[in-house]
C-alpha cells in the first residue's frame, strides 16, 4: 500500500530551488491542466485539487522546468 503524502506549500522555499517566479505558475498551470484532462499524478494525496497536486510534484522534483537555460538568460543582471 502506498503512503499518502501530506503537503504544506511553501512558495518561498520553492523559489529558492527554482528562481523563476513567473515560470513557476506557468509550469504548475500546465501540469494541473494535464492532470485534470488526462495525466495521472506522480504523488498520492488526499487533495484532489490539480493545482495543489502540481505544486506538490514540482516541489518534490517529480516535474521540472524544461529549457531552464533559456530562463537563466532572462534573469536581469543587477549591477
Swiss-Prot record:
One of its GO terms (cellular component) is DNA-directed RNA polymerase complex. Pfam families: RNA_pol_Rpb6. Coiled coil: none annotated. GO terms for molecular function: DNA binding; DNA-directed RNA polymerase activity. Disulfide bonds: none annotated. It catalyses: RNA(n) + a ribonucleoside 5'-triphosphate = RNA(n+1) + diphosphate. InterPro entries: DNA-dir_RNA_pol_omega, Pol_omega/Rpo6/RPB6, RPB6/omega-like_sf. It is an enzyme of class 2 (transferase). SUPFAM superfamilies: RPB6/omega subunit-like. Keywords: DNA-directed RNA polymerase, Nucleotidyltransferase, Transcription, Transferase. Its EC number is 2.7.7.6. GO terms for biological process: DNA-templated transcription. Promotes RNA polymerase assembly. Latches the N- and C-terminal regions of the beta' subunit thereby facilitating its interaction with the beta and alpha subunits. The RNAP catalytic core consists of 2 alpha, 1 beta, 1 beta' and 1 omega subunit. When a sigma factor is associated with the core the holoenzyme is formed, which can initiate transcription. Belongs to the RNA polymerase subunit omega family. This is DNA-directed RNA polymerase subunit omega.
Amino acid at each position: 500500500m502506498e503512503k499518502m503524502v501530506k503537503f504544506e506549500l511553501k512558495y518561498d522555499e520553492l523559489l529558492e530551488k527554482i528562481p523563476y517566479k513567473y515560470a513557476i505558475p506557468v509550469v504548475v498551470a500546465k501540469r494541473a491542466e494535464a492532470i485534470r484532462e488526462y495525466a495521472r499524478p506522480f504523488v498520492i494525496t488526499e487533495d484532489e485539487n490539480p493545482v495543489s497536486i502540481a505544486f506538490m510534484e514540482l516541489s518534490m522534483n517529480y516535474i521540472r522546468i524544461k529549457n531552464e537555460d533559456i530562463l537563466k538568460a532572462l534573469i536581469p543582471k543587477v549591477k
